[in-house]
Amino acid sequence: MGLAKLVEDYTQSEAASLAQQLRDQLADYSQAYYTQDAPLVEDHVYDELYRDLEQLEAAFPVIVTNDSPTQKVGGQVLPGFTKVTHEIPMLSMGDVFSEAELAAFDQRLRKNTATEIEYNVELKIDGLAIDLIYEKGRFVRGATRGNGTIGEDITQNLKTIKAIPQKLTRPVSIEVRGECYMPKAAFADLNQKREAEGQAPFANPRNAAAGSLRQLDAKVAAARQLSAFIYTIVTFDDVQATTQSEALHVLAELGFNVNPTSVVCQNMAEVQAFIEQYQGTRNDLAYGIDGVVLKVNDLALQRQLGNTVKVPRWEIAYKFPPEEAETVIREIEWTVGRTGVVTPTAVMDPVQLAGTTVARASLHNADMLRDKDVRLLDTVLLHKAGDIIPEISQVVLAKRPSDSQAYGIPTTCPSCGHDLVHLDEEVALRCINPMCPAQMKEQLTHFASRNAMNIDGLGPRIITQLLEKELIHDVADLYRLTADDLAQLDKFKEKSINNLLNAIDASRQNSLERLLFGLGIRHVGAKAARLLAEHFQNLAALMASDQETIITVDTIGTIIADSLVTYFADSQVQTLMAELEAVGVNLTYTGVTKAQAATSDSYFNGKTVVLTGKLEQYTRGELKQLLEDNGAKVTGSVSKKTDALIAGQDAGSKLEKAQSLAIPIINEADLDNYLAQ
């Protein structure tokens, strides 16, 4: 292999001809690898041909074609993802979790149809739903599901995935859907690299895949080794298939990567056999699955059965029960949180569970540790809550060592040595030392967070260094930091120093509610902080108020009032507030008052609004605040009194109810237009 002569010795015509041969050859190899699961050549052979093509295209840029394999790795950094409308909505899928529920689904369908039913049964890939559009055989657009109606255009990132063909085997126009996923090996490799670089590992392959597809730089997505299976034809004028199994065959013939495991089942006994087969071997697969999907095989019957507002009536997902694994507890660690809560974590022999290695599991609090009677050297059963969070199900008492002793709950803080307290009506142990280093780190992280003082660039890693070098001791010290101070931090150069100092300086002007929330006063969340700041208008007035005065604020009760009075009565807190004022932090409310919001000419003024789904541009709290500033009343449930529903991604029952009541639905893409009205 390798080019027959030096690249500069080729004419443009020769180079164009050879490049096209290489493209065709690479396309065949790629299809065999991804579609037929039968590689024709070793990986290194593919790589050498790929490099030959790269050399030719680099020497003769005019011969590059849009569907060339070399164009799958995008070099374009997108300014942002544009929203796209799904002409045919990407609905959710109903799920069941037991054989009885699955049988009930089957009986319901058979009762409502006059014909015999067979199912196409497929593995439920644990990934991210995608929609692909091809025109005359060429890939032109790819999108996420979004909220089912509005998705995001992620075409450039999807072009980096080898399993998604740029060009089909026939010049047809078609819309298809499938699942993008990260193979287990790629996930393990990615997390290993992230941990080596000091980054937090992804929780699971699905999150990793979703995060990769949302990268604005397609090169980042390309490096993540994503793959995809296609399983649905949405629109295709030339389709001859009459069943789902035939449709999968058509997809494979067109060059799509189709999962080869699907089978047609005539009855529930055959379905159950398929479930048992893959429930027992799921960890042997190169990709993650979390169940199987049953689809009525007859496409005409699918159309006859139709959909509910949210899900198709002709398909269902059977979710596998959580897997369990057995391991031994070697240590119990205690960590201190922002509010002084001390939490136990079991450190165990590493064990494979649901496709990942688990060596730690939270025990949540001292009471749970006592109730479960977890001890050192105990053998325990683990499962993953929601297939994500490791939890101890039970202690295997038959394997407990004969000399085992009940675990002693600590009485002093593992960080500062201060006595721990168990407050009335709480399950948590607490360290109440305000100068506890572990608490200080968490408090500073909270203070700088997005919903509090919003100091961009001030994260846990920087805060840890600032504390270790004794450059700060409390939140007021942040506003005394200099460029010389920050220059002492590891890998902190001039640009980073200036950016952080500017962010700290800008936070001085925040309205009072951000400061109140950022201080981390017990029971005072973002909503309570806003109500208090708007009512009292300045910090001095709040600090001077007693419990009776504070509870006159709308929705503020005695628990919050007691917490505030206790907090501000502390002499150290009073000193800290004086220091914050001295360093120029704003201590007054500068937000929109209710009276101002009531006179707003905004579209939302006077309207009752409900939020649902995952929002991309805002946190839930930020959008709620913005709507209230525009005169809206934001509530948590949909009713006939609701004037509008703002729906983000993965909207659930609230969206379905709003649609049934004909309540206007506003998607996030259109929200700015409404706010501008």
Swiss-Prot record:
GO biological process terms on file: DNA repair; DNA replication
Bilayer-crossing regions: none
GO cellular component: cytosol
Uppermost EC category: ligase
Pfam families: BRCT (PF00533), DNA_ligase_aden (PF01653), DNA_ligase_OB (PF03120), DNA_ligase_ZBD (PF03119), HHH_2 (PF12826), HHH_5 (PF14520)
Chain sites annotated for binding NAD(+): 43-47, 92-93, 122, 145, 179, 295, 319
Catalytic activity: NAD(+) + (deoxyribonucleotide)n-3'-hydroxyl + 5'-phospho-(deoxyribonucleotide)m = (deoxyribonucleotide)n+m + AMP + beta-nicotinamide D-nucleotide
Entry EC no(s): 6.5.1.2
Record family assignment: Belongs to the NAD-dependent DNA ligase family. LigA subfamily.
Protein name: DNA ligase
Source organism: Latilactobacillus sakei subsp. sakei (strain 23K) (Lactobacillus sakei subsp. sakei)
The encoding gene: ligA
